[in-house]
Regions:
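Aromatic-lined ligand-binding clefts that engage carbohydrates, nucleic acids, or primary amines
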Residues: 115-129, 158-160, 242-265, 272-273, ...
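Extracellular beta-strand elements of beta-rich domains used
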Residues: 128, 184, 242, 385-387
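Short strand-edge motifs at loop-to-beta-strand transitions and within beta-strands
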Residues: 105-107, 143-147, 238-240, 277-281, ...
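Aromatic, loop-rich ligand-recognition surfaces of beta-strand-rich domains
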Residues: 269, 332-340, 347-394
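A glycine-anchored, Pro-Gly-centered beta-turn/N-cap motif
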Residues: 154-156, 248, 289-291
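Edge beta-strands of jelly-roll/beta-sandwich modules across compartments, strongly enriched
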Residues: 164-175, 303-312, 353, 376-389
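Carbohydrate-binding surfaces of carbohydrate-active enzymes
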Residues: 1-227, 284, 300-303, 321-335, ...
Length: 394
């Protein structure tokens, strides 16, 4: 299914947005085909009816498949910027006169030699970049409010790309403002003390989700935000054309894409998010044309592969949840390539107990120890491990 645009809602408490549509468990699919639930209802009605029920009419919509096609990255997402603002404090989408879409927030960072923690209340999906390099995300769905940042130099550029998702439209959470809600701050340990910086002097740029803005971005020679924008590929606007000899309803498969919106021949087809479970967008045949057709995709995360196709059945139950590579499920191997060790060094030669002392406090859910020989770098085994606190207690 799809809501043909942006008006999906979200459940609360917590934040559980509908990616692109509500599922009310109806008796018919979008293409008017009867569901299993319809046939069960019909069987129940027939059981208590004294007359034979009329025959099920044939579905009026014809389903077609569209061959796999590759889209080209035509323009950076920043080319969709149509309005900019500057403020001492970050401002919301609503203060920028925008109900949905994405916003770019930019400010400068202080020098922090040890790395820091970014504290942020972002509605709804925030991606962080330092000098154009992606450093992480803050996802409201997971109730995330912090992000670990690497060491920074004075004047390093922090860019936050914030996308609005479904709105809570009931209860105490009905005032569901989008964007950065409140102050954004950094905390870090400096000489044993926790120091806090509240980030000020923000520059904002709005990117509306509309077909006209997409066309503008595809043809824009440069961004209105100029040198302030530094969003890397593969985030951006993608486009392709394809030809059809016959039209009919179809389901566009978006499972290789990241997160964003699809336009078909000028119509807002719906939103997508790779995590699913819905991986297809229903496309009514009346929006397709014999001859040349156009698809524009706005992806605020970037695709795994910029391909899509039309199929004659929906894919509504395929989860592709983001998984952490640092966990201790049986049979799993943590990925520590990008992790900064708390302690490293060589143990004494020989068997027996060895003591490893952390030079600073460390907090986490799991302890991972990577051991290898000094001769050829191959892994070695550890028989027992005991963790002790600063008082020597296990």
């Amino acid at each position: 299914g799809t809501s043909f645009g942006h008006w999906a809602g979200a459940n609360s408490p917590g934040f559980a947005p509908d990616v692109t549509s509500y599922d009310y468990d109806a008796f018919f699919f979008n293409d008017t085909a009867a569901t299993e639930k319809y046939h069960l209802l019909r069987q129940t009605l027939q059981k208590y009816s004294t007359q034979k029920l009329p025959a099920i009419p044939a579905a009026p919509a014809r389903l077609i498949s569209i061959p796999r096609m590759t889209l080209s990255l035509v323009s950076s997402l920043c080319m969709g910027v149509d309005s900019v603002a500057a403020s001492r404090e970050p401002i919301t989408f609503e203060e920028m006169n925008m109900g949905y879409g994405s916003m770019i927030y930019r400010t400068d960072l202080p020098q922090i030699a040890t790395g820091s923690t970014l504290h942020i209340d972002g509605h709804d999906f925030v991606q962080a970049f330092i000098n154009g390099k992606y450093v992480g995300k803050v996802d409201r769905v997971k109730n995330e409010r912090t992000l670990q940042l690497p060491p920074t130099q004075q004047g390093d550029r922090l860019t936050l790309l914030v996308e609005a998702m479904g709105r809570i439209n009931f209860g105490r959470s009905i005032k569901d403002f989008k964007g950065l809600i409140g102050d954004v701050s950094l905390t870090a340990d400096v000489d044993g003390d926790e120091v806090t910086w509240t980030l000020k002097d923000w520059q904002m740029a709005r990117i509306k989700d509309s077909y006209s803005h997409a066309l503008r971005a595809l043809s824009a020679p440069q961004s209105d935000m100029g040198p302030l924008v530094d969003l890397p590929k593969p985030i951006g606007y993608y486009r392709t054309t394809f030809r059809l000899k016959q039209t009919g309803d179809t389901f566009l498969n978006m499972e290789t894409w990241g997160k964003g919106l699809v336009y078909l021949n000028g119509h807002a087809l719906g939103r997508f998010w790779s995590i699913g479970p819905q991986q297809t967008l229903y496309c009514p045949g009346c929006w397709l044309k014999k001859g040349e057709n156009e698809i524009i995709v706005i992806d605020v995360v970037g695709p795994r592969e910029p391909v899509l196709w039309g199929q004659d059945n929906p894919e509504l139950d395929k989860l592709q949840l983001e998984r952490s590579l640092r966990h201790n499920n049986i049979g799993d191997k943590p990925d520590l390539n990008s992790a900064t060790p708390v302690a490293q060094g060589a143990t004494k030669a020989g068997n027996g107990w060895q003591t490893i002392t952390f030079s600073q406090m460390a907090q986490g859910r799991f302890l991972a120890i990577q051991c290898s020989t000094t001769h050829d770098g191959k892994p070695v085994a550890v028989a027992e491990i005991y963790l002790k606190d600063k008082n020597g207690k296990r």
